[in-house]
Structures are given as C-alpha cells and as structure tokens.
Amino acid sequence: LGDVYKRQSLDMQFWLDGGWGVDVLYGQQTRLHRDIDIDFDANYTDQLLDLLQERGYQIETNWLPTRVELYSKELGYIDIHPFVLNADGTSKQADLDGGWYEFQPDYFGTAVFEGRSIPCISAKGQQVFHSGYDLREKDIHDLSIIKQCITTMSLTIR
C-alpha cells in the first residue's frame, strides 16, 4: 500500500478499489491480494502510465479506455481504471463493449487505514462493483466483509 500513499502526492484524484479497497474499509487486511486496484481521473491516464513505467512496471493487459494491468517484479501487480469525473460528483467508466458504467457520488469516500486517510470506494460502491458477474471465492469473501462494514456503520449511526 506504500505506492497508494505516494500517489496521493500526484495531485490526481483516485480511489482504492478491489480487495484492498474492501480491507481498507474494514480497517485491516483480511486476505492475500494479487494486485492493487486504483480508480483514477482519466485525465491523468498518460501521466500515471508514464510514472508507473518509470518505477519499473510493465504493461501486461491494455484494455484502455477500461483498464490497464501492470506488473513489476519488485512491486507486484497494479490494475488501474480510468474514470471520467463529472462536476456534479458522478463519474463513469468505459466498458469493454463501447458503453459506460455510471457511478453515483456516494460510491466514493475515504477510510482510515494504518493511521492514514485513504480515498477508497465506499461500501455501497463496493457492493455495486461486486455485481453483474460470476462471483469468485475472493469476491464472496469481500462481500461478507463489506456487509460487516455496513452493519458496523449502521450500529454506529443509531
């Protein structure tokens, strides 16, 4: 997660997503992770790719404008997802068929992890992002953690 902290200095809006995003919401690591998923302002796609390649990452999968997966022997896998950000707080991501996924403002938030405030996909957003496909074992695990986060938030609000 050290790279996530460094990305905060890029002046680029981003959110931690995927399994690490779930664990950050929960406040601790609950499983092993193959990669780190970052959703970010699509206006910075070239700049982010240049930075990652300068740090030793090589492109493994290029499905732009939807996503790019990169790998570094020293740093592992990172999966970046360009989002078009709108002034009203909504956003969208290109899908593989030429359409768009549309996202509401409350899908984005922050959580404290290891004493730092980390921009991440909210529990509500994680539920949506974990739908529309056949769930793998790790997705089922992540959804159970998300449900625990939502239950804890509901108890705290009351």
State what each model feature region is.
Residues 6-36, 41-42, 47, 122:
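Active-site nucleotide-donor binding segment shared across nucleotidyl transfer reactions
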Residues 93-158:
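Catalytic cores of NTP-dependent nucleotidyl/adenyl transfer enzymes across multiple folds
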Residues 48-54:
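Short amphipathic alpha-helices in soluble, non-transmembrane regions
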Residues 1-5:
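Short, small-residue-biased leader/transition segments that mark boundaries at the very start
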Residues 8, 53, 112:
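Anion (oxyanion) recognition and catalysis
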